Amino acid sequence: MKIGVFVPIGNNGWLISTHAPQYMPTFELNKAIVQKAEHYHFDFALSMIKLRGFGGKTEFWDHNLESFTLMAGLAAVTSRIQIYATAATLTLPPAIVARMAATIDSISGGRFGVNLVTGWQKPEYEQMGIWPGDDYFSRRYDYLTEYVQVLRDLWGSGKSDFKGDFFTMDDCRVSPQPSVPMKVICAGQSDAGMAFSARYADFNFCFGKGVNTPTAFAPTAARMKQAAEQTGRDVGSYVLFMVIADETDDAARAKWEHYKAGADEEALSWLTEQSQKDTRSGTDTNVRQMADPTSAVNINMGTLVGSYASVARMLDEVASVPGAEGVLLTFDDFLSGIENFGERIQPLMQCRAHLPALTQEVA
């Protein structure tokens, strides 16, 4: 099973709590995180894109770096780990993304890929005057389908004459092309999102579910597997989890309860309000899971809370789910969390037993 880190491009990572570590996103922090992840044989690093935060006492995600420029910098200071940036496709023409991706492919030596998102948070785009209207909620995957076709043209032949409802290319050129086939990833959980991933993505992200229920996402992975079978492609699921680990189950649980007790209710209220704006995409979208009150303090990603041995066991359970090819991990404290994962959790995981021994220390 592949292991990735979801780098904290926004302030405070993924805990919406006054009791959680409070920090600003910086290049130096993310460099330290990704270099440490590479040292511990993580397979990939991904950054999201967020253009407006949730506010509240913690000013959650009000402070964000930009994904492509951050990952270009990280590509230059790593050597093995795969690097993925996220394109907010309403903000960037596909021909520009194609060229930026080809550039980072050159920087990284063929280790770069692109995560495509349609955009769900209306205020991110309204503030710039580029929100296309609420009809976009029901047409966003039509838009993304045209977008990725332009990308594939330009990365493949270096030329596109694509004509569609949203994009018109007229002998559009990009050169040089990427040195290896460019991977495209997506995070669709709605039927439309999975249908898109089945046709165009190399793999699809989905949310884990619940606290210490590592296989609860299995129906989502099964839906993705079924959608991919209909297109004759192999599109695996990569599952998002937060790891909160300590020496004992009780110590880890105490940290989790402490974070929940400090939940930033103002920021969470804003998230809930935004989740209700899209009335056209159905009930199975990512944002509706994020806003579910069950575990909103970490946007309802699956949460693994326990001793190092307990977390290792639960991750092996994740690996046993058909269609699950990897996990994307966040941590309550990224630097110590990755070190503890590499030193204390990963060596206990049967699904990572193939890894070579560590040979050097990392700062």
From Swiss-Prot:
Disulfide bonds: none annotated. InterPro entries: Luciferase-like_dom (IPR011251), Luciferase-like_sf (IPR036661), Pyrimidine_monooxygenase_RutA (IPR019914), SsuD_RutA_monooxygenase (IPR050172). Keywords: Flavoprotein, FMN, Monooxygenase, NADP, Oxidoreductase. Pfam families: Bac_luciferase. GO terms for biological process: alkanesulfonate catabolic process; nitrogen utilization; uracil catabolic process. Its EC number is 1.14.99.46. The keyword ATP-binding does not apply. The keyword Transit peptide does not apply. It comes from the Bacteria. FMN binds at residues 49-50, 115, 124, 140-141, 190. Induction: Up-regulated by the nitrogen regulatory protein C (NtrC also called GlnG) and repressed by RutR. Coiled coil: none annotated. It is an enzyme of class 1 (oxidoreductase). GO terms for molecular function: alkanesulfonate monooxygenase activity; uracil oxygenase activity. It catalyses: uracil + FMNH2 + NADH + O2 = (Z)-3-ureidoacrylate + FMN + NAD(+) + H2O + H(+); thymine + FMNH2 + NADH + O2 = (Z)-2-methylureidoacrylate + FMN + NAD(+) + H2O + H(+). Belongs to the NtaA/SnaA/DszA monooxygenase family. RutA subfamily. The FMN-N(5)-oxide reacts spontaneously with NADH to produce FMN. Requires the flavin reductase RutF to regenerate FMN in vivo. This is Pyrimidine monooxygenase RutA.
